[in-house]
A protein has these predicted regions:
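Basic, low-complexity segments
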Residues: 1-9, 37-58
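Residues at or immediately flanking beta-strands
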Residues: 33-35, 84
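A solvent-exposed interaction/effector surface
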Residues: 24, 48-53, 60-64, 68, ...
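Short helix-capping/hinge SLiMs at alpha-helix to coil transitions
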Residues: 28-32, 80
Length: 286
């Protein structure tokens, strides 16, 4: 009985590791065709196994997931800078603007230009209704980059129970691997914009910096946060104010954003007195 349970856990760990590999590979290569046989070869499974594993993990087909990721990445790019439809299409893996526009309309029901105008109007409405000040103070810094170990959460950003479970698992993993030190930094990677993506499909990586080599194991993966120039905003108080701050940044951003990963760093965190919490948001800039 114990052997059977151990085998089941081992198989589950292998599957979780493969899911991490696929999701990270897709995220880094949305500009490519992303053929099924290539992805299956990368994780050493058949195409049929790949589709089955990923449907179970994503609660949607792999084809639907990739198509959705391409379009949602395009929205991010459109918010970053103005570009031709031809350039935008190629950046998210479409051969021509016609195919891209058709896929975009299938997902959102309107054209890319109409959608981005509607999104901007919606964000401005959020900021006005919150009564938030338009002026934002940002420090400019050059970030050296970090090696991270992560655990992924699918679902509504900041939902108490899954986040608490994930962070506790991450802390235990760090301790088990003797990777928790006084220099460990705690990072949050939000891959999706809840103003664009359904809240239950948002991907969050709870991360910790590591100095030593960590082998990806089960649900724990590794990722590198790239070096570069960032505008850094500070939130004092509960993390529940993060989305309001992100909306304010989107509407009142005074820098030229570059393609890169925005991230959060949790400088101090207390559940019993959240007013003393300090969170920094790093926005990649040119």
């Amino acid at each position: 009985m114990q052997i059977t349970e151990a085998m089941r856990n081992s198989t589950e760990n292998i599957y979780q590791q493969k899911v991490n590999q696929v999701i990270d590979y897709i995220s880094a290569n949305l500009h490519l065709p992303l053929q099924l046989d290539v992805i299956a070869d990368k994780i050493n499974v058949s195409q049929r196994q790949l589709l089955r594993i990923m449907r179970s993990a994503l609660n949607e087909s792999l084809y639907t997931y990739v198509a959705r990721q391409r379009i949602e990445r395009a929205v991010l790019y459109m918010q970053t800078e103005e570009m031709s439809l031809t350039t935008l299409s190629s950046m998210v893996g479409y051969d021509n603007p016609q195919s891209f526009s058709k896929a975009f309309k299938k997902q959102f029901g309107i054209s890319p230009k109409a959608y981005i105008n509607e999104l901007q109007s919606r964000l401005e409405g959020y900021v006005q209704s919150s009564g938030n000040r338009s002026s934002l103070q940002a420090e400019i810094c050059y970030f050296e980059g970090l090696e991270l170990v992560y655990i992924r959460i699918f679902g509504k950003y900041g939902e108490a129970e899954p986040y608490e479970i994930a962070w506790n698992k991450l802390m235990l993993f760090l301790k088990d691997n003797q990777a928790l030190t006084l220099e460990t930094r705690f990072i949050g990677l939000s891959f999706d914009d809840p103003n664009v993506t359904n809240y239950n499909q948002c991907r969050f990586y709870a991360c910790a910096s590591v100095k030593k080599k960590i082998v990806p194991t089960g649900e724990f993966g590794t990722i590198r946060l790239q070096q570069g120039k960032y505008a850094v905003y500070t939130l004092k108080g509960s993390c529940s104010g993060l989305q309001e701050l992100y909306n304010n940044i989107s509407v009142n951003f005074e820098h030229t954003i570059r393609h890169g990963m925005a991230f959060e760093e949790y400088i101090s965190y207390r559940t019993e007195n959240s007013k003393e919490n300090i969170t920094k948001i790093y926005m990649p800039i040119k």
